Amino acid sequence: IEGSINNYLLSNDEKFLYVITSEWNEEFKNIESKDSEPMYYENLPFRFDTRGIIYNKRGNVYKVNLQTGKSEKVVNGDKHNIISIDSLVENNGVLTFSYDKHNSKGTMLEERIGYLKNKKIVDIFTKGMMGNLFYYEDELHAVGLRNRFEWPTNTTILKFSQSGKVSFKYRLFDRNIVKAEVHESILYFLYEDSGKTLLRNGNEKIDLIDQNITIKDFAFSNGNTYVIANSFSSPDEVYELIEGELNKISKANDSFVQNVRTRDCIYERIDTGKSEIDTWGIFVGKDKPTILNIHGGPASQYGFTFFDEFQTYASAGFNVIACNPRGSTG
């Protein structure tokens, strides 16, 4: 393909692989020097997106026969004008996916959830911002917002009925959920809490770990739990999670850690009288200049995560302060 593979899904019978791609659209494929070709607009989109249109890309899904290696395009992004495809699930032989396309006026991206029926896309939901589709207790779920740009509402787990009606899985859970997965009938999810990103057992409502870290992904194998995690002073590594503790099993950044000095943070939650502000600081000396980083939010946050800019500032002799005055997403 002339593009990139964004995601993939093994079919339930393990005979096929569904591959999500981002490729040049049909019209743009014929241009020899793609990098120098300008874009022409008759009207300016309300919001420039980075998902495809300004790069002339379209999202497709291929079905690959694992035995023969042959493939067929089952979702044609050019035909349906799909800018990108985020998540894909299979249930009872039906493919359901979340995807982006522009509205009828061409002024705004719409995120939709639809399923494939006789090579046609039947939309289930069209108003929100959703991805990370999964089935739990034989019902379709997604992580996201019911309405686009519904900030500062937290992203959460939403449940869909067959008619497309949406309800909250955890209505009273007031933290930002970023990823969910079902393993052995248990629903696990990552959520943000005051600068941390932690892993939670949704069935039992308990955290598998409570440390000042950011967990970026998780997986299960042979009864073991694995996470990709980092902290304020340590970059990403793979860890096995054992009784609430991290056991490092990868060496991806060992050389970096051995050769580059990193600094841990001082954390304070500052009460202004009207709200509480999560704040992190690196102190290198009282006679040193200070850089204040204020997060615009509320769609993201500074936190207990490895950020090379802060480490670079500190190495150059600056004190560093980073805060979330509009609220951490967790």
Describe each PLM feature range.
Residues 82, 104, 129-132, 148-150, ...:
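Flexible loop/turn segments at secondary-structure boundaries
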Residues 65-69, 116-119, 161-164, 202-204, ...:
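Short loop/turn segments that connect beta-strands within beta-propeller blades
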Residues 22-64, 100, 110-112, 156, ...:
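Predominantly five- to eight-bladed beta-propeller fold
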Residues 219-224, 228-330:
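Serine-hydrolase catalytic core recognition
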Residues 2-20, 26, 48-54, 77-104, ...:
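Conserved beta-propeller blade repeats
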Residues 27-30, 58-60, 104-114, 150-158, ...:
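Structural motif
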